[in-house]
């Protein structure tokens, strides 16, 4: 494989892209993180966190910064407020972590993720930048993107591309 500017380009900087940025930074992998939005979305979408998420985050050393609360159960109600599906979380294994399922407030979770990802010198984070094109040849990913504010266009390359752009 030929030399590239980055090892990985991360397309999207929501919860999955933020997690990738933190893990790539933790392992010293040179990454370019791109997202068309400058700021995090202010409303929650992802709201739960299980033991698998917690294991991944343990590597990033910021678990104490994330505010979580335990889920005791769920009671889904119809329009007349009658219970139609009730689930209790009693008896779920905790896998030596806090609890198997926790509630999170995603905007706060995103902010903690992003602040932590900045500390890794191998991360280049460019929010407010939109990917224009991606192609791959001879084991190299070529990417062009532009700064949405200035319109300035850039070209770069990497060994890998992680598509973390979610619903966008």
Q: What is each stretch, according to the model?
A:
Residues 25-45:
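Glycine-rich FAD pyrophosphate-binding loop
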Residues 127-141:
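A conserved short coil-to-beta-strand element within the FAD-binding core of flavoproteins
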